[in-house]
Structure formats: C-alpha cells, structure tokens
C-alpha cells in the first residue's frame, strides 16, 4: 500500500506509530517508491481473509488507506472470495456464535471476508453460465436480463464446494450509497433471513453488504507448466472487472476527464449497467443455501454482472 501513495501520506516518523521512511536499518523501507512514482489508476486484489482475524483498529486504518486511494483517483477492486459465507483457506471456517471469534470449524455463524467488507473498495463476486439455460433471444436482448447464475464449483481434488462469497461486515456499517439496496434485499428475503438468524448462522448487524458486482468465475484457461488448464474463482472475476474500469478510464482521459477513483456510489445510483443475476446462492456454515441471488442487489452477486457498453455509458458521464 505504501507504494501507492505520495510522500504526504507516508505517515509519522515515530516508529511506534508508523514505519520510518526512509529507513536505513535492515528490513527498512529503503526500496519503497512512496512519492517517487505515479500510482496506478486501478488496483486489483485477488485476496480474501477472515475479517475476524484483524483488530477493529487495523481494519479501520487499512480501510481509510483504501479511501485515500479512491480520493486520489485510484479504483481499488477486490475479489469477494470463493468460500460462500465461510472465510479462510481450505473451504473456509465459521464464527463461534457465542464468542464471535473464529471457531476453526465449518459450522456456526457466517464469517465475512476482508478486504471486501471495507466500504471504500469495490468487491467482485462470481457467476457462471446457467447449466440448464436454454438459448433465448429475449435473454440475449432484454435490458438487464442474464443467463448467468451464482458461481458454484466442487473441487475435483479436495471435493470442497466453492461458492461466491458474500454477506455482511461485522465491523463496518452499511454505507449511505448502498443502504437502500441492502434494505430492499433484507425486506425481500425477510423470511429466509429470519430462519438463518434463528439457526444461529446470521445476525443482522446492519453491516456493509458485499459483493458490489459480480463477473464470470468459471473456466478461465491458463497455461500451467506448459499445459493448458482451466481455473475457477473470483480471483479471475476481479481482474476482469478491473480491466473494464481501465478501458473506461482510458476513454475518460481522451475526453480530458479524471480517472474514476472510488466507484461504488455511481454503480449503486443506476443498476441499468448490470445484468441482474437471480439464480443460485452461496453456502457455508451448515446453511445451504446461505444467501440467495434475488432481483436487485443481493449478498451473492451484488448488483449483477456488468455489460461493458452500458457500464461505459454510465461511467463516462461521471464528473
């Protein structure tokens, strides 16, 4: 993160507060480029970790750093994760309902992901082509329609079920830009959410909901050790969305407009740029489904998957 800011954001010189910069001691920040290079205009993060594993002070401090980047015209995009309502490696774990701490088990209360829980980044969930979808001209042409469903994949080696991560932060309140969307989802899913709450899986903390958007998370072809293979997950979704934003930034720069920076208020202000994903859900902590994909924003696929041309039309006019 240090490399993304100019020197005025490098912080204090008190080593008990911030690292000394520049620092000539072994392991110091001698080689960092804080203040020496122009920061990238889009940052894509294919990483997620249990929010509960970090202190509130760390989460808030780091989230403010993301906000600073947004104010500098840098868009920060992160994959929501592939472990549904669990978080961590090997399919993820859940929270102890009694303590709220990591239970190191696959049952209990939903465990939100970091950094997707930060309201100042754009979280990207996962979709896939509907397995049983019949070709439909209407689906191909109707504004906002989708032949996608929420991402779900069973690992061929570990036999673990992976689904698009989504849920609600236990540390950050829902920001103003998404309150109406989150409220509509909770109202639409009231009966289901009440069952999840009664079973100890979910507690309505009024937290920031994620993901914000979603994109294809299946069948990415890569070369591994000289052989072609396919991979799955939102670690592919996030950089594809980041590429779209980079292209839109280029179009804005041609018009002498600034880069977009923090995206979310503009995305939530108009859902017309997205294909609404209403099929599927995610899983975790003994709940199947956990959260469901629904019309409008949902805690599985967010606002839906972007249509590039419509997204360009929306974001090219942002001041």
Language-model region placement:
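Polar, glycine-rich mid-to-C-terminal structural blocks
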Residues: 119, 123-176
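An often Trp-containing, charged/polar helix-loop segment at the C-terminal end
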Residues: 132, 153-155, 185, 200, ...
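Short, electropositive, low-hydrophobicity segments enriched in small/polar residues
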Residues: 85-88, 129-130, 237, 241, ...
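Substrate-binding/charge-relay-adjacent region of secreted/lumenal peptidase catalytic domains
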Residues: 1-86, 90-123, 172-230, 253-255, ...
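A short, structural micro-pattern
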Residues: 37, 115-118, 143, 154, ...
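Basic/polar, cationic surfaces and motifs that engage anionic cell-wall
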Residues: 290-294, 306-311
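C-terminal substrate/ligand-recognition segments
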Residues: 211, 232-251
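Active-site-proximal beta-strand/loop segments in catalytic clefts of secreted hydrolases
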Residues: 45-50, 79-83, 124-129, 146-157, ...
């Amino acid at each position: 993160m240090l490399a993304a800011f100019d020197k005025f954001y490098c912080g204090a010189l008190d080593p008990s507060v911030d690292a000394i910069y520049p620092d000539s001691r072994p392991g110091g920040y001698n080689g960092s480029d804080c203040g020496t290079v122009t920061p990238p205009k889009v940052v894509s993060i294919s990483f997620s970790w249990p929010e509960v594993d970090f202190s509130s002070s760390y989460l808030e401090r780091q989230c403010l750093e993301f906000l600073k980047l947004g104010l500098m015209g840098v868009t920060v995009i992160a994959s929501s994760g592939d472990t549904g309502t669990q978080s961590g490696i090997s399919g993820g774990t859940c929270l102890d309902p009694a303590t709220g701490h990591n239970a190191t088990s696959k049952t209990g209360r939903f465990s939100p992901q970091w950094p997707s829980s930060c309201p100042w980044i754009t979280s990207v969930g996962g979709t896939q082509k509907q397995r049983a979808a019949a070709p439909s001209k209407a689906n191909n042409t109707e504004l906002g329609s989708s032949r996608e469903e929420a991402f779900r994949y069973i690992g061929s080696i570990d036999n673990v079920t992976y689904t698009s991560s989504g849920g609600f932060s236990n540390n950050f309140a829902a920001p103003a830009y998404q309150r109406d969307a989150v409220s509509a989802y909770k109202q639409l899913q009231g009966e289901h959410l009440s069952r999840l709450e009664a079973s100890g899986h979910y507690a309505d903390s009024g937290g920031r909901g994620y993901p914000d958007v979603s994109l294809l998370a299946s069948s990415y072809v890569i070369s591994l050790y000289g052989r072609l293979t396919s991979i799955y997950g939102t670690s592919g979704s996030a950089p594809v969305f980041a590429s779209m934003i980079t292209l839109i930034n280029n179009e804005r720069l041609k018009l002498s407009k600034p880069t977009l920076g923090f995206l979310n208020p503009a995305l939530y202000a108009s859902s017309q740029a997205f294909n609404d994903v209403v099929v599927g859900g995610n899983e975790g902590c003994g709940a199947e489904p956990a959260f469901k994909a629904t019309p409008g924003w949902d805690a599985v696929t967010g606002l839906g998957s972007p249509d590039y041309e419509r997204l360009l039309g929306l974001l090219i006019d942002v001041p």
